[in-house]
Every structure is written in C-alpha cells, then in structure tokens.
C-alpha cells in the first residue's frame, strides 16, 4: 500500500465512501476532472479499481457527490443557524466559524466546482449553482441586517468577496496551525462584513 493510500485508510466511523469522497475532492482540486482517473482515485483511497463502483455509478457521479454533499451540509447548517439564533451578529460568527472549519477540513466545494464545472452536465451545474446561491442567501440575509448602510447589491458583493477570501485558505495556508487560521480568518471576515463604511 502506498503512503497516500495508508493515509486515507478508513478510521473508526469512516466509510469507504467517505474516503473516496475525500481523496477525490483533493484530486479534482489539484488536477481537475480530466486529469484524474478512476485508478488514481482508487489507489489514493487504498481500494481496488472496481471498488469505486460499489459506491458510485462512475467518476462523474463521484464528482457530483464531492461537490453536492458538503454544499448541502453547509446550506443546512446555515439555515438551521439562522432559524435558531435570534442575534444576527452571533449567527454570523457561527456561520463564519463553521465555514472556515469546513474549508480547513476538506477541499473547498466552491473551488472544486469552479475547476471542474466544464465536466458537469447542464442539469447538474444548474442544481449545484442553485444550492450555492441558497447558501449565500442565508449569509446575505444576516449581513443585510448588520449593514443597513449598504444597498442589497453591495451586501451581495461584500458577502461573495468574503467567501472568496475564506475559500482561499485551502490553497494559501502556509503551515499555520488550525487555531491560528480560524482566529485570523474569523477576525478578518467578521470585520469585513460588519464594519460600517468608512472605517
């Protein structure tokens, strides 16, 4: 077994499917869909080639799951947080923290989607973009309350800019520990989203 495969051996509570999703996400982000083969994915996951088809119909189905599964989790968390937390500032802090931890823990969904969008059928692209927009709307609704000085287009621009900043952690991290990353990026994101214009 290769070193990479050993690193992705399923631990307690981790299924083969989860391992395939993780290694495929890393590979799709690094090489894009066209540069990744089923053999590459299975070797990195430490399973035989046919093993992938026990969990996914094909490589394309795996790509769709790589993007949709974490995106659905982000959207659900954002929706539940917005519903459960009455204070918008606290809700925003929770969303920022969760998003950063998600980016640190796995290849960011948005970057994977952007790099591999060309490989997806139109119906899948539309569905994924709709889910991304719904996730963003949860943030925009909260930021709009906290930033009455901004117009709706300005809030949208600001929110998506902060998303780009947070997602960049996956590719720009230069060896900082997780706590330092979370603290630095959370502070920057909250300040950007809540500071009145001119400050």
Feature-to-residue mapping (PLM):
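Hydrophobic alpha-helical connector segments
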Residues: 65, 80-105
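Amphipathic alpha-helical segments used for helix-helix packing
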Residues: 103-123, 171
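N-terminal intrinsically disordered/low-complexity leader segments
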Residues: 1-15, 22, 79, 197-199
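Generic hydrophobic, amphipathic alpha-helix propensity
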Residues: 16-24, 41, 66-70, 74, ...
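Amphipathic alpha-helical packing segments from all-alpha helical-bundle domains
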Residues: 72-75, 122-147, 156-160, 187
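Short, structured motif recognition centered on aromatic/hydrophobic residues
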Residues: 28, 74-75, 92-96, 112-114, ...
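Helix-turn-helix
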Residues: 2, 19, 23-61
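Amphipathic C-terminal alpha-helical segment
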Residues: 102-105, 152-153, 159-179, 190-199
